[in-house]
């Protein structure tokens, strides 16, 4: 009986260890870049910030992006993310712009996480009221790969296909570039405080095998004990 208990305990400890390893992969690696730079008002040249990723051994499963932007006029901003293998996602594209709102949203700033499957960032006022302040929460990237200078009605039906799914299956190592520009004038000064990139990679096949084997060992000891 003592040997059975010892074997079961070892199997459980192994499962915990493997689970922790797998959990780290599922949580991903986060790379934060402090910028603290003004985004020139009404200037399409914009601001570029690059972070370099290295040492990841597997392809991308999913990504998230954090944006901390203060001040300005949210509806003036256009931003995109370029990956090292050519992946491209539109993060912001004149949020709020539509035939019903040709002047877009006038709230000041973002402190948000962009993640696939979350509510549409472009029409965030349909979900929440920031009372003119900084938007918070988790949102899907804008994804509208159209010119930010398009007529307001074009935004009504634009596809949201320039999203984070385009990075899945690509190699994460290399330079990731954030571009952001203020394309309106007179809306005040926006500042990019920081941005973060979280990369979740596909787990190694042996990780799944180890977890499955651990469960098998645990079940076997339980049956033997009975």
PLM feature spans:
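A short, hydrophobic C-terminal helix/tail in secreted or cell-surface proteins
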Residues: 204-222
């Amino acid at each position: 009986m003592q040997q059975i208990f010892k074997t079961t305990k070892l199997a459980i400890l192994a499962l915990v260890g493997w689970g922790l390893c797998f959990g780290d992969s599922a949580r991903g690696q986060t790379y934060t870049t402090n910028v603290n730079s003004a985004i020139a008002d009404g200037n399409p040249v914009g601001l570029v910030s690059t972070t370099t990723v290295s040492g990841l051994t597997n392809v991308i499963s999913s990504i998230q992006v954090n944006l901390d932007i203060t001040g300005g006029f949210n509806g003036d901003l256009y931003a995109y993310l370029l990956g090292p293998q050519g992946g491209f996602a539109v993060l912001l594209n004149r949020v709020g712009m539509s035939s019903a709102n040709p002047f877009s949203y006038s709230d000041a700033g973002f402190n948000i996480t962009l993640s696939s499957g979350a509510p549409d960032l472009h029409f965030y006022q349909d979900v929440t009221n920031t009372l003119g302040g900084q938007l918070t929460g988790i949102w899907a990237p804008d994804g509208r790969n159209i010119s930010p200078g398009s007529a307001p009605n074009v935004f009504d039906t634009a596809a949201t296909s320039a999203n984070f799914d385009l990075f899945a299956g690509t190699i994460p190592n290399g330079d990731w570039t954030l571009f952001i520009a203020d394309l309106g004038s007179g809306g005040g000064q926006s500042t990019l405080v920081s941005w973060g990139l979280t990369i979740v990679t596909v787990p190694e096949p042996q990780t799944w095998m180890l977890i499955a084997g651990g469960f098998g060992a645990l079940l076997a000891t339980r049956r033997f004990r009975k």
